Amino acid sequence: MSGQQQATSVLVFFVNGKKVTDTNPDPECTLLTYLRDKLRLCGTKLGCAEGGCGACTVMISRMDRGQHKIRHLAVNACLTPVCAMHGCAVTTVEGIGSTRTRLHPVQERLAKAHGSQCGFCTPGIVMSMYALLRNAEQPSMRDLEVAFQGNLCRCTGYRPILEGYKTFTKEFLCGMGEKCCRVNGKGCGGGDDPESVTDDTLFERSKFQPLDASQEPIFPPELQLSNAYDSESLVFSSERVTWYRPTTLQELLQLKAAHPAAKLVVGNTEVGVEVKFKHFLYPHLINPTLVAELQEVRESEESIYFGAAVSLMEIDALLRQRIEELPEAQTRLFQCTVDMLHYFAGKQIRNVACLGGNIMTGSPISDMNPVLTAAGARLEVASIVEGKISQRTVHMGTGFFTGYRRNVIEPQEVLLGIHFQKTTPDQHVVAFKQARRRDDDIAIVNAAVNVRFEPKSNVVAEISMAFGGMAPTTVLAPRTSQLMVKQPLDHQLLERVAESLCGELPLAASAPGGMIAYRRALVVSLIFKAYLAISSKLSEAGIIAGDAIPPKERSGAELFHTPTLRSAQLFERVCSDQPVCDPIGRPEVHAAALKQATGEAIYTDDIPRMDGELYLGFVLSTKPRAKITKLDASAALALEGVHAFFSHKDLTVHENEVGPVFHDEHVFAAGEVHCYGQIVGAVAADNKALAQRASRLVRVEYEDLSPVIVTIEQAIEHGSYFPDYPRYVTKGNMAEAFAQAEHTYEGSCRMGGQEHFYLETHAAVAVPRDSDELELFCSTQHPSEVQKLVAHVTSLPAHRVVCRAKRLGGGFGGKESRGISVALPVALAAYRLRRPVRCMLDRDEDMLITGTRHPFLFKYKVAFSSDGLITACDIECYNNAGWSMDLSFSVLERAMYHFENCYHIPNVRVGGWVCKTNLPSNTAFRGFGGPQGMFAGEHIIRDVARIVGRDVLDVMRLNFYRTGDTTHYNQQLEHFPIERCLDDCLTQSRYHERRAEIAKFNRENRWRKRGVAVIPTKYGIAFGVMHLNQAGALLNVYGDGSVLLSHGGVEIGQGLNTKMIQCAARALGIPSELIHISETATDKVPNTSPTAASVGSDINGMAVLDACEKLNKRLAPIKEALPQATWQEWINKAYFDRVSLSATGFYAMPGIGYHPETNPNARTYSYYTNGVGISVVEIDCLTGDHQVLSTDIVMDIGSSINPAIDIGQIEGAFMQGYGLFTLEELMYSPQGMLYSRGPGMYKLPGFADIPGEFNVSLLTGAPNPRAVYSSKAVGEPPLFIGASAFFAIKEAIAAARQEHGLTGDFPLEAPSTSARIRMACQDKFTNLLEVPEAGSFTPWNIVP
C-alpha cells in the first residue's frame, strides 16, 4: 500500500458482543453473507440485495472520536461490505433478546400487537425500531415514520406494526397517566362496555414490559477505550478484488493516483448494486471514511462545509438544527436540502450514504444533484501532484456534468467536500421530486430552482433551474432562465416559461425510462409548483399582493405529508360464559410471532448447511423467443469448485415435461426458449457466488424466432390463444334483453399484472437419503405437487420423496405452482450427484422467472333501464397467460364467474380467452382472477350510473343481489348480507358528511382534488377444481398430554397453524399451549391440496375436527369413568388401557362440483364472503401524486376464529389490493424483457402509504353454517376493496377535469400510477405537449 503507515490485513469487529477476527476476509463479501454463512446468524434475512426492503437491517455501532459518543445506525447488511466493519460493533436481532432468555420490548410489542404474519420482514423491522430507541428512548411518531422508510412488509398492511410501536412514542402518553385508555388496553371505542356485542381490544398494552435502557447490551469496551482499530490502515485482498482503507488524506490520494479507476466506497449503496446486478468488477475499492478531511464539518458566516464522506443523516441533522437557530432567510437552501433528503432512499441508506458519492456517481435521477447544481455548489477536490497534495475548487453548474455519470473531476482526484451557502433575503431555493412512491423511491423527474430577486421586489435578478430525469445528466435550462431575468415573477411570465421549457427540454419518444409525456409535463408542473411556493413567500413578506396568487391555487405548492395514523378495529365479543381455555373467537397471538420477532423462526434457506452441500445457479434465457443453436458449459465447468452442469440433455423428453395441470413446461428449455428468464440450465458449485459466476460463463447461442407476442392486444391480433378457447358462460335471453333495452353502452377496461413480492423468494434444499429416497425442504404452498413432480423428474415412486414446508415467508399464490421452477432442478442435482443441493433465488431472478398476477382486458356491452337497472351484459375477458398454461384457465374462469361482483344481471354472456404470449408463465395470485373480474363489474356499474345521471350508490343498491337470486353460473345465494355491510360502512365512514366535505374542498382547490368511492365485494369460496376441496389431518397425543398436530395446509403467514391449534383446543377442551404444529410434510398427511383459494382454514379445520372427534370418541368411556380427572390423567389412563392416541381426520367439502352439463344443480362455491370498503383519496393534479386519507371496511367473515388474525388479513389484503390498483406497475420492454426486477423500480406500498384513518369492523351476528366453527374465509376476499382507492382517484380526476371544462368519461388503466393520474388531469400544461404519432417510434416499455 502507498504511504508510510504499515497496513494490516486482519479484520476485527464485534457481533452481538462477541469478537470476530478474520485473517482473510473477502472484499466482495457483504455483512449479510458473513452473518448468515460464516456466523450462522440467520435471523437477518435476504429480501432484495439492493437495500430496498429492509429485511436485512442490523444495527452498527461505532465510536465517534470527534463527538466522543457512540453512534448507533440501522443499516442494510445486504449492501454493507464486511470489510467496512473493522472496529465496529454489529447487533443483529438475535443479540437483543430471545424466547429462551428474555424478549426485548421491541420484539414483544411487535409480536403481541399482531405485527408479524409471515415473519420474514419482522427481524428487519425489529432492528429498525431497536436502533431508533438506542438513539432516542422516547421517539416521536415522525421518528417512527422516518425509521421505517426503508422497510417493507407484504403481509400486515403496516397498521399493527405502527400500533405496537406507537406505545414507545411521546404521543402515546397523555395527561390521564395510568388511566389513559391507550395504556390500560381498553381502547377509545367503548370496547369495555359489558352490554356491547363488539370489542375493540386486540392486545393489552398494559401487559407490555417496560423499556429499560440500562438493560441494553454494552458497547464493547475494547472499541470504546482504544482507537487502535480506527487508526489502522487496511488492505484486504482476494483473487479478484483488493480493499483499501487509508487513514490519511496523503494515503488516499496516493492510492487514487496509483489506481485512478478505483471506486471510493462509503455506504456501498451504488457500487454494491452495480456489482450485484450489473456484475461489474472493480479490482480496487477504497474506503475513505476514516480520512479526517472527508469527515470534516465547518461553519462560517457564509456557508456550512461538509466533508464528502459525511453521511446524509448527519448532514440532515445539522441542517435541521441550523434551520431552528438561524433566520429563515439564511436557511432556504438548508430547508430545500432537508426536504429532499427526507425522500432520499430509506433511513438505512441515509445512515451510511454520503453526498460525495451522490455527486460523483452523477445519476441522472439523483435527488441531490439538481439542488446542488441549481445552487451552484462549490466543491473542494484534491490530488497528488509531484508528491504533494494539490487542491482546487470546482463549481457545480453549467458544464460540471460532461456525460452519463461523468463530470469534470479527474480520475485521480478526490472530492473533499461541499459548501452549502447561506441564502440572502432576496434569494429563494425550492425543490420538488416526483416518484412512483413518495418514500424510498428514485425520482421520475425532480427540479430545483434557485432565484434571486431585485431587492424587495418580484423582479428576477438571476435564476437557475436544474432538472433530473430529463437527460443523461442533471441539466439546466439556461435559455428559459435568461428569459426570466429582469421580469416580474407572475402568471404571465409562467405562461412563457412553460412554453420555453417544453422546447428547451425535449425528450425522445423512445427515451429510457419511458413515461415521456408525463416527464415532460412534470418539468412544467414542478416549476409551476415552485412558482406558487416562492410567490407564497413573497406574499407573506408583503412584496407582492396577498391576492396575487388566487386562493384556489395556493394549495398547488403543498406536498403530501404522512399523517399520524388513526385506526379502530371492531369485532364480536366472545360470550361471557365461554371457558377461559376455549380460544375460539379470541385475538390470540400468531403461534410463531415471538420466534419470528427474535429471528429464531427457521425458513428454508436458514436450514444449516450440510457437509458436502452444493449450490445451484441458473442459466436463464436472454431471448423472448428463439431456437437454441449452441449450449456450451465448458468455461463454467473449468472453474475450480464447479461440479456439474444440467440441461434438458440430462432428462428424457417425458421427464423434462412438467406442469401443475398440463405438462406443457420444461424443467430445462429444450430446443427453444419462449420468454426471457426461462431456465436453460443449472450449474452446481461449492457456494452461491461461484454458482452464479459460473452460470454467467455458460455460452448459449440463439436463432431468433418470430413473432414475439407480449401484450394481450398482440395476442388478439395474431389469434394467439391456448387450445379450447374461447369458452362461454350464458344465462337468459341476450337478444331479447338488448332489443328491449332503454339504453345500451359499450366500454372496456384494462388492468396490469402484479408481482407477488413475498419477502422470502423461492427456495429449496434437497437431500439424498438411503434407499433412493429424496428429502426436500421447500418454500411451497403445495408440497404434494412438488413431491409428485420430483418423483416424475427422477423417475422415483412418490413414496421415496418427502417434501417438507415448515413456514413460508409469504406466498400469495406465487408459491402454489411456480415453486417447481426451483425445486425440480435442485432435486435432480441432488439425486444425480448424491449430495445435498440448495438454491434460493435472488430477488431479480425470482421476479424474472416466476410470473405475476394475470393482466386482463375486458370488453363489454351492457343493457339497462333509465333508472339504472342492468338487464343484460355481454362481456369478453382476455388474460395474458404467458408462454405456458399453468393455472391460467382457472384464473380466467374465476374472473368470468366474478365479473358481476355483487350485482344481479338476469341476462349474461361472458366469454373468456387465455392469451398465449412470450412472457414468463403468469400464475395464481391472491384473488385468482376474482379482483380482475370485479374490476370490470365496477366499471360497468359506474358507466351505467354516469349515463343515467344517478348517484353510483343508488345504482349499486338498485342492482344488488338479494338472498334467493341466482348467479349466471346457476348458484342460488342463500345468505347475502351486502346491504347490511354497506349500511354499516356508510355509517362508520361518515360517508354523506364526507361527500359534502369533499365537494367543498374541491370547490376551494384548483390543483388538489378529492374523491370518495364505495366498493362492495362478493368472493366465492372453494377451489374451482372439485378434487382439491379436500384435506387431511393427523393428531398424535403423547403420554404427557402434549399434542402434535399435523394437517395438509402450509403456514404462509396467514395464521393457519394458529387457527388450527385454536380449533383443536376447543374440540379437545384443552389449552392451546398443549398443542404444537411442527411442519407440513407429505409423509404426515398425504395427497394434500395447495394452501390456496382461501379455504385453508375451512378444509383443514374440518379435518382437524374430524381427527379430534375420533379421539374424543375413544376417550369418552375414560372421561365418563373419571369425570374429575385432568386431561393428562385421561391420556395416561388411555395409554395403559391400550387406547390409540393417534387419529387421522379427513374432510371433503360437500355439495360442490357445478358443471353446466354434467352437474348443473351443484354449487360452484361453498359460500361467499362479502364486504364493503369506502376510501377517501386526495390527488395532486400537478404531479399525479395521491394520498389515501381514510379507509373504512366492514367484512362479513362469519364467526371469527381469531379476530386479530382475520383483521390482519383484511388490512394486509386491502393494502395489497391498493398496491395492485394504484402503485405496482410491471415494466416490460417491447420484446418482453422485465425491467422491474426489484424494489428499486417495482414499488409496493410502504409504511407511509397506509390510509391516514384505517378502520375495520367485522360484521356481528352472521354465523356461517358451512365452515368450521361458523367462520368464513378471509384471505382473498378483502383484496378487491383496495380498488376503492382507484375509483376514488378516478372521481378526483373527474373533478380536476371539470375544472378545465372536460366532462364525460375518460380512460384510466390500473394501476392508477402518478403518471396516469397526472396525464388524465388534462390542463393548460399538458396541452403544451406534442404527442408523437403511434407507430412512429418504438416505446421504451409496453403494458402486457
Swiss-Prot record:
Q: What is this protein called?
A: Xanthine dehydrogenase
> What EC class does the entry list?
oxidoreductase
Q: Where is the 2Fe-2S ferredoxin-type domain?
A: 9-96
What CDD domains does the record tag this protein with?
Answer: fer2
User: Which annotated residues bind FAD?
Assistant: 264-271, 344, 354-358, 367, 415, 433
Q: How is the cofactor bound?
A: Binds 1 Mo-molybdopterin (Mo-MPT) cofactor per subunit.
User: GO terms for biological process?
Assistant: xanthine catabolic process
Q: Which InterPro entries match?
A: 2Fe-2S-bd, 2Fe-2S-bd_dom_sf, 2Fe-2S_ferredoxin-like_sf, 2Fe-2S_ferredoxin-type, 2Fe2S_fd_BS, Ald_Oxase/Xan_DH_a/b, Ald_Oxase/Xan_DH_a/b_sf, Ald_Oxase/xanthine_DH-like
Residues involved in Mo-molybdopterin binding:
Q781, F812, R926, A1093
**Residues where [2Fe-2S] cluster 2 binds:** C118, C121, C153, C155
Task: Quote the function comment for this protein.
Answer: Key enzyme in purine degradation. Catalyzes the oxidation of hypoxanthine to xanthine. Catalyzes the oxidation of xanthine to uric acid.
Q: Which GO terms describe its cellular component?
A: peroxisome
What chemistry does it catalyse, as a reaction equation? xanthine + NAD(+) + H2O = urate + NADH + H(+); hypoxanthine + NAD(+) + H2O = xanthine + NADH + H(+)
> What is the first-listed, main subcellular location in coarse terms?
other
- Which PANTHER family does the UniProt record give? XANTHINE DEHYDROGENASE (PTHR45444:SF3)
Give the originating organism. Answer: Drosophila subobscura (Fruit fly)
Which residues belong to any copy of the FAD-binding PCMH-type domain?
236-425
